[in-house]
Regions:
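Short, solvent-exposed recognition segments
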Residues: 17-85
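Juxtadomain coupling helices with adjacent low-complexity linkers
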Residues: 88, 105-147
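Short hydrophobic beta-strand micro-motif common in sensory/regulatory domains
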Residues: 91-95
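Sensor-regulatory modules in signal-transduction proteins
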Residues: 97-100
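Amphipathic coiled-coil signal-relay and dimerization helices
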Residues: 3-9, 14-19
């Protein structure tokens, strides 16, 4: 029902930061939506049936119908967005990581202030896609897990 981030870096810091970040609901976080987009229909229906969908901001998607449109866009582009859905002023972009069998096993994401991310959206998307490809190609043990 939720996604847990366990690693973060900050570009203007010389200190490597490893920590857990508050658990965010899947339906309103980029990493959660990246994973949900690849659930089969039965698993997705079960998620929406049991999940309490609360509006966190004016932009939060809270219906299965609205998510289905988002799901199609995610599958076409390969990227999921949190466009101020979890927190106002925050924009996140995520890509699912697949194992050899085609199952989503993890997600990677980039987050930042809305204005800053919008100014570099295409560049960030390209770098995120490159990182996704690198991780999938060079990670052999991912086939042991599935979200």
């Amino acid at each position: 029902n939720a996604m847990l981030s366990i690693y973060s870096t900050y570009p203007n810091s010389s200190v490597l930061s490893i920590k857990t970040i508050p658990i965010s609901p899947m339906y309103c976080s980029a990493i959660g939506k990246a994973a949900l987009a690849y659930y089969d229909d039965e698993k997705l229906a079960a998620y929406f049936k049991r999940q309490d969908l609360r509006k966190r901001t004016a932009k939060t998607i809270i219906t299965r119908e609205a998510f289905e449109k988002e799901r199609e866009r995610i599958r076409e582009s390969g990227l999921a967005y949190d466009d101020e859905e979890y927190e106002e002023g925050l924009f996140c972009m995520a890509a699912p990581l697949f194992n050899a069998e085609g199952a989503v096993v993890a997600c990677i994401s980039v987050s930042g202030g809305y204005g800053r991310m919008m100014a570099k959206k295409e560049k960030v998307a390209e770098v995120l896609r490159q990182a996704k490809e690198f991780i999938e190609v060079y990670t052999e043990s991912m086939d042991r897990f599935e979200l």
